[in-house]
C-alpha cells in the first residue's frame, strides 16, 4: 500500500476557506455531492485496516486502507476504480470481507497545486477540510497557502473527528455503528 499523505482540519469557517481557495487559484472539480460507502473488515486480521466500496458520484472505487498510528505517514491506501457498486460489495463479501457498516457523507472537491482539497460533511458533524498531496512537505506547504495551521492537523480517518466532536470512541464508530446516514446521524456519546 502507498502512504496517503493527508491532513484533516476541523473548526473551519467555510465561507472564508472557499474565498481563500478561489484567491489562490484552486479549481472546483466537483461540487458537493452525496457519497455512499460500504465498509468491511478484511478477511485476514490487519490491525487498523478496512476495505471499502465507495460511490463518489462521478466514479466508484474499491480500496483497502490502513491507519497504524496518528502521524501523517501512518496512513496507507490502495484504491481501484470499478464500474459497479453492488458488484464491488459482492466481490468483497465473496473473498471473506466482513461487512461492518453503510456510511454516507457529502463532499466538495477542489484541486490546487496537484493536491486534492476536500470539504467533507459527515452526518452529525460540522464540515471539515482534508488536504491530500504526494508528500508531507507538500501537505504542509499547501496547508500554509490555504491558511490552515498544519500543527492542528489530524491524521487518520473520520473516527478521530467523531471522537473530538461527539465523544464517540473509535471502537464504537468503527465496530458498533452499522449505519451512518444523514437520516440517522450519530449523536453525542454518553
Where are these regions (language model features)?
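A contiguous pocket-lining binding segment that forms or flanks enzyme active sites
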Residues: 120-126
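A hydrophobic, small-residue-rich beta->alpha segment in the mid-to-C-terminal subdomain
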Residues: 136, 140-149
Amino acid at each position: 500500500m502507498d502512504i496517503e499523505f493527508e491532513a484533516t482540519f476541523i473548526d473551519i469557517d467555510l465561507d472564508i476557506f472557499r474565498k481563500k481557495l478561489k484567491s489562490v487559484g484552486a479549481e472546483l472539480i466537483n461540487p458537493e455531492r452525496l457519497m455512499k460507502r460500504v465498509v468491511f473488515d478484511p478477511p485476514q486480521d490487519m490491525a487498523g485496516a478496512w476495505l471499502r466500496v465507495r460511490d463518489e458520484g462521478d466514479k466508484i472505487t474499491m480500496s483497502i486502507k490502513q491507519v497504524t498510528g496518528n502521524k501523517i505517514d501512518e496512513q496507507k491506501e490502495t484504491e481501484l476504480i470499478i464500474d459497479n457498486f453492488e458488484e464491488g460489495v459482492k466481490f468483497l463479501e465473496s473473498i471473506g470481507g466482513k461487512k461492518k457498516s453503510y456510511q454516507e457523507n457529502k463532499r466538495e472537491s477542489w484541486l490546487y497545486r496537484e493536491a486534492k482539497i476536500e470539504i467533507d460533511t459527515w452526518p452529525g458533524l460540522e464540515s471539515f477540510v482534508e488536504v491530500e498531496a504526494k508528500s508531507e512537505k507538500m501537505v504542509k506547504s499547501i496547508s500554509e497557502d490555504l491558511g490552515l495551521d498544519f500543527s492542528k492537523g489530524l491524521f487518520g480517518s473520520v473516527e478521530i473527528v467523531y471522537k473530538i466532536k461527539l465523544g464517540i470512541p473509535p471502537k464504537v464508530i468503527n465496530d458498533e455503528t452499522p449505519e451512518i446516514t444523514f437520516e440517522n446521524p450519530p449523536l453525542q456519546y454518553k
